[in-house]
Amino acid sequence: MKIALDPTPFHHTHKLLEFPAVAAELGFKYLQMTPHPDLIPFFNHPKADDNLVKKMKQACKDSGVEIASVLPVLRWSGPDEDAREAAIRYWKRAIQITVDLGVKTMNTEFSGRPERAEESERAFYRSMEELLPIIEREGLDVLIDPHPDDFVEDGLQAIRTIRGVNSKNIGLVYVASHTFHMNQPPLTIMREAGEMLRLVHVSDTMDHKRSHGLRYITNPPGNSVRVHQHLKIGDGDVNWPEFFGGLKEIGFLDNPNSVMCSSVFAENEKNKETAKYQLAKIQEMIG
């Protein structure tokens, strides 16, 4: 299993090409490349040219760090057809960047809309018809997270939707911080997913359903807002023994190609301290 750092907490203190050295300094051997304005920004066309990709690859080599996964967030399930078609073009470039970096894993979100779930599902499968031949040709794993405020938020429904693509190259991401939006305990989802689950994000969150749903109060009452955090392990309500125990049970921890990414976003002012804590805690909990 690869333990990776999400460098998002370092976006305000370091440049893109400095991320590999930061990861190495903190004891990580792997990076996950999440959306960044100089590489693949949220929802828009990738901004890295071939020269920048080569520089990024060299920076990793110089630091002894590998990129475990590349994470684009693009509207490939968007119910707006113009946005969906654009996302397909962006995805093709993101795939080429990933291949040129020598990376075999991409992870992402469904990126549709919950209030237009049926149209979003149609858009998702339409996009997969065009992208899947490229994904399979390049030998990539593309793993998908049922993110809060998406057309698929339920963990078991995410598995069904991915299964419908009918490709071993498409799998599941489990983000611990999304646990309380997925409607089933981690172990239930992990057991159902089995080998489909090949990437997890490790960060804690509060259970927004506790205290009669009044742990968080948003106004006006009854609005459709989703709330979660990306806290360090132990600062929220995630059942970590169940989480790590489930991963061990399904063989995730013994898979050399699976990725476990530390993704704490709530403590940028203590980014290095938090990253070191996360790595030590992960190593402790996997034994």
Segments (PLM) and residue ranges:
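Active-site acidic/histidine proton-transfer and metal-coordination neighborhood
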Residues: 17, 54, 58-66, 76-172, ...
